[in-house]
A protein has these predicted regions:
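Alpha-helical transmembrane helix bundles of large polytopic membrane transport and channel proteins
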Residues: 64-84, 107
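Beta-strand residues that line the small-molecule/cofactor-binding core
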Residues: 6, 156
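Short, hydrophobic beta-strand elements of compact beta-sandwich sensory domains
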Residues: 48, 158-180
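Extracytoplasmic/periplasmic sensor domains and loops in membrane signaling proteins
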Residues: 82-101, 116-154
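Extreme N-terminal signal-anchor transmembrane helix of membrane signaling/transducer proteins, especially
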Residues: 9-38
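Short N-terminal helix-loop-first-beta-strand/juxtamembrane motif that initiates sensory/input modules
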Residues: 46-68, 91-114, 144
Length: 180
């Protein structure tokens, strides 16, 4: 009887030790995963920031003048740079985004005025309003912001927002890149 009892105790101790080891392994894997994820997120953020700056510099080179928001007779808003309406200039935008494999939107204040994102009917998703979080962080906070869990059209994406400033330092809009 005594021998059997000891064996049961040994098995219990062994099982407990294995459980602790398994738990430690899970925690270590969790931490490693977080570290890998963090560095991946950082790389993704850097990559997206460069793409935003590239796109904005292409616009700057192509259209002299300052960003502005106009309104047509129907009340619809549009994006201007200098004298040019740019929110319907999609040739370059679509080509760049296809090559880089990203989606891009430009917001005037909080409204999406230019985008490569299309709905299920193939129509560009124009006129939608940025989320309250984005308005707070990017427009009001005037800060470039990277989100790792933004949902757009039901797909989770990495999203990077870059505020667009007027010459007097006011935030006029947001340049937004998203990567699936």
């Amino acid at each position: 009887g005594m021998k059997k009892k000891n064996q049961g105790l040994k098995q219990k101790i062994l099982f407990t030790t294995l459980t602790v080891l398994a738990l430690m392994a899970a925690i270590v894997i969790g931490l490693a995963y977080k570290t890998i994820t963090d560095s991946m997120h950082e790389q993704t953020r850097d990559y997206m920031e460069k793409q935003c700056k590239l796109f904005l510099s292409i616009l700057d080179n192509h259209y002299p003048g300052e960003y502005g928001i106009g309104q047509d007779t129907s009340g619809a808003y549009f994006l201007v740079m200098g004298e040019e309406v740019i929110s319907d200039e999609y040739d370059n935008l679509d080509r760049i985004c296809k090559v880089l494999d990203v989606e891009l939107s430009v917001f005037g204040r909080d409204m999406r005025l230019m985008t490569t994102i299309c709905d299920e009917n193939g129509e560009r998703v124009i006129g939608t309003i940025a989320s309250p979080v984005v308005i707070r962080d990017v427009l009001d906070g005037a800060t470039p912001t990277f989100y790792t869990d933004a949902e757009i059209s039901g797909i989770e994406r990495f999203v990077y927002y870059e505020p667009i400033f007027t010459q007097n330092g006011e935030v006029i809009g947001i340049d937004r890149k998203s990567v699936v």
